[in-house]
Amino acid sequence: MKIRIDIPHHPYDIQIEKGCMAQAGQWLRELWQPQKVVIVTDNHVASLYAEKVKLSLEDAGFQVAVFDFLEGEERKNLTTVQKVYEFLVKQGLTRSDGIVALGGGVVGDLAGFVASTYMRGIHFVQIPTSLTAQVDSSIGGKTGVNTPFAKNMVGTFAQPDGVLIDPLVLETLGKRELIEGMGEVIKYGLIEDPELWALLTGLNGSVESILEHAETLIEHSCQVKRKMVVEDELDNGIRLYLNFGHTIGHAIEATAGYGKVMHGEAVAMGMVQISKVAEEKGLMPAGITQSITEMCQKFGLPVDYENWEVGKLYQALTHDKKARGNTLKLVLVPELGSATIHPVSLEEMKDYLVK
């Protein structure tokens, strides 16, 4: 299946097909002329797929080198970026060459940032290998790295030339790594897609059920992301809906220490906490927090952060990228399948941190 991201200045396709990673070279040959390519990945993904993708690209006429770094959210920083820059220079990459981001969200965010800044921007594509990356982070052009202060604090908007999604690679994920991706899938059902929510309701929550329906879950999620990115590429309006659960979720990730709490886990806890307080304030319908909680728990996602410290979380919130002056744009769900922006002051945001 192809989903067109029809952004006027940089349209591209998301290709979703079981087994398509084996044809990565042919796919890229249709996008780029033969040239130098650097595959940016982490050491874990490299051990599984780097050689396979490298050979496919070489068969299609590309000159290929591989750069891998130690896996983990804690490596998504400017130190790693500098190492990639140095590797690209040594390989002689020019503005006519490109980067293939092969991996999960950490790899995709970092490689995209490198591509968008190296020589003021070179071409790149995404081949996401985690559920979170396949349904969310590989699509839409947000790139970035973390700082000690906040997640994704340094970044750019830079669209890839294409996204290649092979649902079969999810079978090599660990249980926790697969399940955390469901945090984003559940979010899509809540903010935009009641049909997806109904599908999730019908699943039993097992790993087997996720893998069996992975292609459909990915397609639904990508369609929601497509709609919001096309209408609002630079995150000033409807695209903000995608941040449901992320305001508190990112604060949890930052205060826990990057890599301790996975992104989808933090989003799940953020959605539950925001909904609980918003429901108490009459801003979200009665019973919706219970529905969200039960859905997250069914798939094995955490719903409560055990190291909850209001002071530290609030400090992290002050660095939120959605803040404008002393106001945060909080995303709420007034009804299933619909989202809205609710501006709150940073002071009022403290209410949403009360357990």
From Swiss-Prot:
Subcellular locations according to the entry: Cytoplasm
Enzyme class: lyase
Residues that, per the record, bind Zn(2+): 184, 246, 263
Pathway: Metabolic intermediate biosynthesis; chorismate biosynthesis; chorismate from D-erythrose 4-phosphate and phosphoenolpyruvate: step 2/7
GO aspect biological process, one term: aromatic amino acid family biosynthetic process
GO CC aspect terms: cytoplasm
Cofactors: NAD(+); Co(2+); Zn(2+)
Bound cofactor: record note: Binds 1 divalent metal cation per subunit. Can use either Co(2+) or Zn(2+).
Gene3D superfamilies, per the entry: 3.40.50.1970, Dehydroquinate synthase-like - alpha domain (1.20.1090.10)
Any GO MF annotation of the entry: metal ion binding
Domain of life from the UniProt record: Bacteria
Assigned keywords, A-Z: Amino-acid biosynthesis, Aromatic amino acid biosynthesis, Cobalt, Cytoplasm, Lyase, Metal-binding, NAD, Nucleotide-binding, Zinc
InterPro entries attached to this UniProt entry: Dehydroquinate_synthase (IPR050071), DHQ_synth_AroB (IPR016037), DHQ_synth_fam (IPR030963), DHQS/DOIS_N (IPR030960), DHQS_C (IPR056179)
Catalyzed reactions: 7-phospho-2-dehydro-3-deoxy-D-arabino-heptonate = 3-dehydroquinate + phosphate
Family under the similarity heading: Belongs to the sugar phosphate cyclases superfamily. Dehydroquinate synthase family.
Function: Catalyzes the conversion of 3-deoxy-D-arabino-heptulosonate 7-phosphate (DAHP) to dehydroquinate (DHQ).
PANTHER family hit by this protein: 3-DEHYDROQUINATE SYNTHASE, 3-DEHYDROQUINATE SYNTHASE, CHLOROPLASTIC
Descriptive protein name: 3-dehydroquinate synthase
Organism name: Streptococcus pneumoniae serotype 4 (strain ATCC BAA-334 / TIGR4)
Underlying gene: aroB
